[in-house]
Structures are given as C-alpha cells and as structure tokens.
Amino acid sequence: MRILLTNDDGIHAPGIHALWRIFDDWADIFVVAPDTERSATGHGITVHQPLRVEKLSFANPHCHGWAVNGTPADCVKLAMEELLAEPPHIVISGINRGPNLGTDVLYSGTVSAAMEGVIYGVPSIAVSVTGWHTADYTVAAETTRLLCEKLVARGLTPDTFLNVNVPDLPRERIAGIQVTKLGSRRYQNIFDKRTDPRGRTYYWMAGEVHDVDAGEGTDISAVNAGAISVTPIHFDLTNYSLIQEVSDWLGGGSSPFADRNKKDDVETKRKA
C-alpha cells in the first residue's frame, strides 16, 4: 500500500506528522507538501516561476518526504508525475488546522489537493480539525485511518473524494459520524490598510464569518453537534437543474447571432 500525504499548512505542520504516524504499520508513506504554509490557495498551480524540491529525511524508514515551494495542487502534480516511482493507492490531504466547511472548500488548499488526487484517478480524502489551536490530532488521525480502510475495501465513484471535518473534542465527546452535504459560510472581509516606509499602500486581508447556513444535514450542523462530518464531493460543478432553463433563454441552441447576421446581410445587399 502506498499513501501520498500532502497539506496546505506546510510539511512541518503537526497534522501531517500525525497522519504518517497513524499509517506507519499499514503503508509506505510519501509526503509531498509545501515548504511553508499555503492556506487558502485554492486550486492554484505555479506556472510563472520554477518549482523547487528538497528531499527530507524522516525517522521512519517507510516514510519519504519532499518539501516543495509551491501550492498543494503543485505538490500532488509533482508527486504523481515526477517524484513517485509508482502512483499511490490513496491521497490524503491534511490534517488541516481549522475547519473546511461549506463554501470554505472553494478556497481551501487542503480540499483542492484531494481534488487533484481525484483528477488523477486516485481515491482521495481531505481532513480538517475544526479547532485553530489544536494540540492533539489523534482523533482526526484515527478517523482518517478508519475511512481509508473503508475506502480501500469499498471504493468511491472515480470523480468523488471525501471532505472530513473532525470536531476539536476528546474522543469520548465525539457524537458519531454523519455523512453530510455542504452548508454555507460567508465572510465579511476585513482589509487593514497600511503604508510601507516608501509611502506605498498595502493591505492585510482577514475576515469573519457572518452568514452561516447550518441547516439539517449540513457539514456545519454536524460539527456543531459534536459529530464528525464526512461529505462526498465531486469536481463536476454543473447545475444540471438549470441546463434547460438557460437553454431556453438562448433560443434552444439556435445561433445567438442569427438576427444580427440577417441584418448584416440586408445591409450588405442595400450597399451593393
């Protein structure tokens, strides 16, 4: 068994170390992760500067590591096409410090790395702990191990990965596992405007959650109730329910320029 680990918190983050320890007796571990924190980079990739890779040593002889000066998606691409002699059986991204709930998944480097794994046809999982100052990743690591065993035994459709959010609670207070849909978390952005010593303006961006859809069955509702949330996500973003409606707007497939072309023909004949 070969497992590829990555994250967006950086290769030295405690969450990714908790993962390679939990899989120590089960698989050969390949860690390919950013050399520094790359949170909220989404599915960005690096195409305008070189990617540099540093080979790292781990105490575990079954664990092989590379630090990359790129995004989480870069890390998965490099692992798949350059660094690993054979493709992994599973890609795991995490354990992220902080939740990836609802619309967070659109910005998350953690989630995007798992998405990249699925694009390569490899079963993938993104894992986050809801606390920002978590000192113990044990429950999240154990949950990941359980889900990976299920994933190997049962499989998923090829375009789908699992987004997992684990409450920052002791094991005895975890209220089970719920399979959920995405909720919604909208942010009020905050821009701290500053001036550098040369008089140029710059900004620090932050934000606060101000609009939450935590309806029944959502990932947000589950973690609020103390349960582990497991959300199947796929990369087909098509809103199938609106295909016919939008088609009707556009004349059911006829050329949107038909009327304009007729007018041009009339004008051409008139001038002739």
From Swiss-Prot:
Gene Ontology CC annotations of this record: cytoplasm
Domain of life: Bacteria
Cofactor annotation: a divalent metal cation
SUPFAM superfamilies in UniProt: SurE-like (SSF64167)
Entry-linked Gene3D superfamilies: Survival protein SurE-like phosphatase/nucleotidase (3.40.1210.10)
Binding-site residues, a divalent metal cation: D8, D9, S39, N96
Molecular function terms, GO-annotated: 3'-nucleotidase activity; 5'-nucleotidase activity; exopolyphosphatase activity; metal ion binding; nucleotide binding
Catalyzed reaction equations: a ribonucleoside 5'-phosphate + H2O = a ribonucleoside + phosphate
Cofactor binding, per record: Binds 1 divalent metal cation per subunit.
Enzyme kind, highest EC tier: hydrolase
Localization per record: Cytoplasm
Keywords, in A-Z order: Cytoplasm, Hydrolase, Metal-binding, Nucleotide-binding
EC number: 3.1.3.5
PANTHER family documented for this protein: 5'-NUCLEOTIDASE SURE (PTHR30457), 5'_3'-NUCLEOTIDASE SURE (PTHR30457:SF12)
Family classification: Belongs to the SurE nucleotidase family.
Function statement: Nucleotidase that shows phosphatase activity on nucleoside 5'-monophosphates.
Protein name (record): 5'-nucleotidase SurE
Organism, scientific name: Heliobacterium modesticaldum (strain ATCC 51547 / Ice1)
Name of encoding gene: surE
